[in-house]
Amino acid sequence: MTDFSQIHKPVLLQECVDLVTPALHASDSVAVDCTLGLAGHTIAFLKAAPNATVIGIDRDEEALDKATARIAQEGLSARFVPVHAAFDQFDEVLRAQGVSRVQAVFMDLGLSSLQIDERERGFSYAHDAPLDMRMDTSQALTAREILATYDADRLAHIFKEYGEERFSKPIAKRIVQQRQSSPLETSSQLTALVDAVIPAARRGSGNPAKRVFQALRIEVNGELDKLRRTLPQIGLHLAVGGRLVVESYHSLEDRTVKNFMAQGLRVDAPADMPVIPPDMQPFFKALTKGAVKADAGEIAYNPRSASVRLRAVELTRPLPQRWVHAFELESQGSEDGVRGAHGHRRRTQARRG
């Protein structure tokens, strides 16, 4: 029997349980774990909410198999439904299960321990490995293919947009030059190339290649696009009183989650309206004050929690399709100056849960 506790430490586990399980008291409650991984959070949810069923989604078949086996070891299989899918197939997954509304949705947007620790997956710059970075190994696109085929402008764009890399253009130029003589095949080759480009005086903390690796991983797996598509789907399927709980690990993810939640926390009425009618009240109630971060004890126990940002909201009234459409349009444009469906700027709702 595998001791998964030695290889998998769920981040902010108790905080997530405390946020998710109050919505799971009814006997027919359904929660969705959009990022099952090795099921650390899901097992805790199942134990804390004995009347609930959890649908566990993961695009990594190996992780899904291991998680399913782990849940069986815990004797919890009767209330668990494993699904091999990407989380942007949320609507499709629920339709296939005959579910229209769910009481809780959880997302842990970080890499799973399995993905980080298996060197051949190529996610970590700490170990030499093939430049793969696929979460779903059945897909075709790999980091190696991106580095071998994207032109300099496209490479620079993803390094800047997804990695917030200041030296995106010179790094992209060097990659194109390098591949004319020999392709970049391994993580150590890429790390050495980036190390040679970034001046020592301009480096921040950590490995100089960390932003490039982040950008490649996001591009390979379409992470931000999938997240932007998924959040509105989740909103439409949450029951009133249902909760959305999200852990993110870099600023781009957190910004996307924060903006989605912030739109639902705003009052859809002019700032000078003295009494706010029910149909202009916020759609969400905040369950966290800003983002919850790991404390020193958590970080000492689980160093991978150092960058986590945990946000949670509760749905207070159903989201209309027009609101979801407005978010989709907004996410394609500026993230500032969010406006309501009536064309006026919406004011921030101060009440916190």
Swiss-Prot record:
Cite the binding residues for S-adenosyl-L-methionine. A39, G40, H41, D58, F90, D108, Q115
Family matches, as SUPFAM superfamilies: Putative methyltransferase TM0872, insert domain, S-adenosyl-L-methionine-dependent methyltransferases
A single Gene Ontology MF term assigned here is: rRNA (cytosine-N4-)-methyltransferase activity
Q: Give the reaction(s) catalysed.
A: cytidine(1402) in 16S rRNA + S-adenosyl-L-methionine = N(4)-methylcytidine(1402) in 16S rRNA + S-adenosyl-L-homocysteine + H(+)
Q: Where is this region: Disordered?
A: 334-353
Q: What job does the chain carry out?
A: Specifically methylates the N4 position of cytidine in position 1402 (C1402) of 16S rRNA.
Q: Which protein is depicted?
A: Ribosomal RNA small subunit methyltransferase H
Q: Which organism is it from?
A: Bifidobacterium animalis subsp. lactis (strain AD011)
